[in-house]
UniProtKB/Swiss-Prot annotation:
Biological source species: Xenopus laevis
Function: Key assembly factor specifically required for the stability of axonemal dynein heavy chains in cytoplasm.
Signal peptide: none
Cellular compartment(s): Dynein axonemal particle
Protein name: Dynein axonemal assembly factor 10
Mapped WD repeat ranges: 64-106, 116-155, 163-206, 208-250, 258-298, 320-358
């Protein structure tokens, strides 16, 4: 990829200004539609559905909600229903039928404080086993919900009595390669990363990356854990090789100083798990490719398997805004199509070219 023209290009296809603070955006599976959620100036929440039509984002519907909506996922919904699960500033977990979004089809008082982050698995053809939703909150707890079970979570990971409650900023499902196995990874404001094994309800691994963890994502949710990317406040991200866990050293990792400011999000390309995008606090996007080492594990001096980290190379970067890009979502259906939101109250649909050449 010597010539600049051979590199992937990041093209702003559609820009749409809105009159509220945008917190999250998600493509609606199997459609040219996406949903945006956020906070109106008067303190209520808003849920909007847009459709791409002739190079424009056309607003199809808008619904106001009592509390600002912080995050959303389709990950626990079937392809037929495509229900959106959201977390709001009041600690409520709601599931919405976007065809009739006035009242939720499921509602639970999930947390005592704001739900910062949400993820889903077991739906939209991703991950074996039951559909589940995980939420993380400022109240320090991480809870796993089965949308078929009302009111009570199926798992609750909270600090032990006497331990300080840390603000949970990001959660991610992974390792859902059969009906029994499933893991949740959570990142906290003090730099802690904790990997919870949901099958035997234990903390499988924990580490600290010294700065608040803004975003976590496995490269795939529905395979044996392969890679995990964690982004942080000080412009760094870390890629952990999750295939080999050393008893004392944990997982091997490589870190990159990606941005000059907070790395708000990381999102892997659904069609190629070694390509991922990071979004920054200065309104920029960086597209990366992970290169594996010649050998992913080796024996240490005691003869124990230890992981070997690879490297991340920058493919392209672009500045779209002066404000942080707070959310980003790749289209699961159309390779290279993505939607992102920024605190400049603009939602942008982007096209990333030449991804099939990587």
């Amino acid at each position: 990829m010597s010539s600049p023209l051979e590199k992937p290009q990041i093209i702003a296809h559609v820009q749409k200004s809105v009159n509220y603070t945008l917190f999250d955006c998600k493509w609606i599976p199997c459609s040219a539609k996406f949903v945006c959620v956020g906070n109106l100036a008067r303190g209520s929440g808003v849920l909007q559905v847009y459709e791409i039509q002739q190079g424009e984002a056309k607003l199809l519907q808008e619904t106001e909600k009592p509390k600002p909506i912080k995050c959303g996922t389709f990950g626990a919904s079937s392809m037929q229903q495509r229900y959106l699960a959201t977390g709001d500033f009041g600690g409520n977990l709601n599931i919405w039928n976007l065809e009739a979004p006035d009242t939720p089809v499921y509602s639970a008082k999930g947390h005592n404080e704001i739900i910062n982050c949400i993820d889903g698995v077991g739906g939209v053809g991703i991950g074996d086993g039951a559909p589940e939703i995980v939420t993380g909150s400022r109240d320090g707890t991480v809870k796993v919900w089965d949308p078929r079970q009302k009111d009570t979570p199926v798992a609750n990971m909270e600090p032990a009595a006497g331990e300080a409650k840390r603000d949970c900023w990001t959660v991610a499902f992974g390792n859902a390669y059969n009906e029994q196995e499933r893991a949740v990874c959570a990142g906290y404001d003090n730099g802690d990363i904790k990997l919870f094994d949901l099958r035997n309800m234990s903390v499988r691994w924990e580490t600290n990356i010294k700065n608040g963890v803004c975003s976590l994502e496995f490269d795939r949710k529905d395979i044996v854990m392969n890679k995990l990317v964690a982004t942080s406040l000080e412009g760094k991200f870390h890629v952990f090789d999750m295939r080999t866990q050393h008893p004392t050293k944990g997982f091997a990792s490589v870190s990159e100083k990606a941005h000059k400011s907070t790395v708000w999000q990381v999102r892997h390309l659904p069609q190629n798990r070694d390509v991922f995008m990071t979004s920054g606090g200065a309104g920029n996007l960086h597209l990366w490719k992970y290169e594996y080492p010649a050998q992913r594990s080796r024996k240490d001096s005691d003869g124990v398997d230890t992981g070997v980290a690879g490297s991340a190379s920058l493919l392209q970067n672009v500045t779209l805004s002066t404000q942080p890009i707070s959310s980003l979502d790749w289209s699961p259906d159309k390779k290279g199509l993505c939607v992102c939101t920024s605190f400049d109250q603009t939602v942008r649909v982007l096209i990333v070219t030449k991804l099939n050449r990587l």
